[in-house]
């Protein structure tokens, strides 16, 4: 796929970027170079490579799901939290209706 100056101008317009003729010509060459490199990546044989989502394993430490008993930082403080809200209804924050 080749990028021409009309495509560069359309992309710049969509991104709300003002570019000059010289900048459009420079971007045309840069974008074509990038797309050529991506095409080269597509030619690499990766049939024997196992897919991965990260370079290092992402493992999370698990902890017990318990409520903290500290009265200042612990859970079960709904009424204290809602006391600071401008509006509360049925134990939830009250917000204005935005969809008719």
UniProtKB/Swiss-Prot annotation:
Enzyme Commission number(s) from the entry: 6.3.5.-
One BP term from GO: regulation of translational fidelity
Keyword Oxidoreductase: no
Keywords in alphabetical order: ATP-binding, Ligase, Nucleotide-binding, Protein biosynthesis
Catalysed transformations (reactions): L-glutamyl-tRNA(Gln) + L-glutamine + ATP + H2O = L-glutaminyl-tRNA(Gln) + L-glutamate + ADP + phosphate + H(+); L-aspartyl-tRNA(Asn) + L-glutamine + ATP + H2O = L-asparaginyl-tRNA(Asn) + L-glutamate + ADP + phosphate + 2 H(+)
Family (UniProt): Belongs to the GatC family.
The protein's name in its UniProt record: Aspartyl/glutamyl-tRNA(Asn/Gln) amidotransferase subunit C
Organism of origin: Sphingopyxis alaskensis (strain DSM 13593 / LMG 18877 / RB2256) (Sphingomonas alaskensis)
């Amino acid at each position: 796929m080749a990028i021409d100056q009309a495509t560069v101008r359309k992309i710049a317009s969509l991104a709300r970027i003002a570019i000059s003729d010289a900048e459009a010509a420079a971007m045309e060459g840069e974008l074509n170079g990038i797309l050529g490199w991506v095409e080269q990546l597509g030619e690499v044989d990766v049939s024997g490579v196992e897919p991965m989502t990260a370079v290092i394993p992402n493992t999370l430490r698990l902890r017990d799901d318990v409520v903290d008993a500290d009265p200042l930082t612990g859970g079960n403080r709904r009424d204290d939290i809602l006391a600071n809200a401008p509006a509360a209804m049925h134990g939830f924050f009250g917000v204005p209706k935005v969809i008719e």
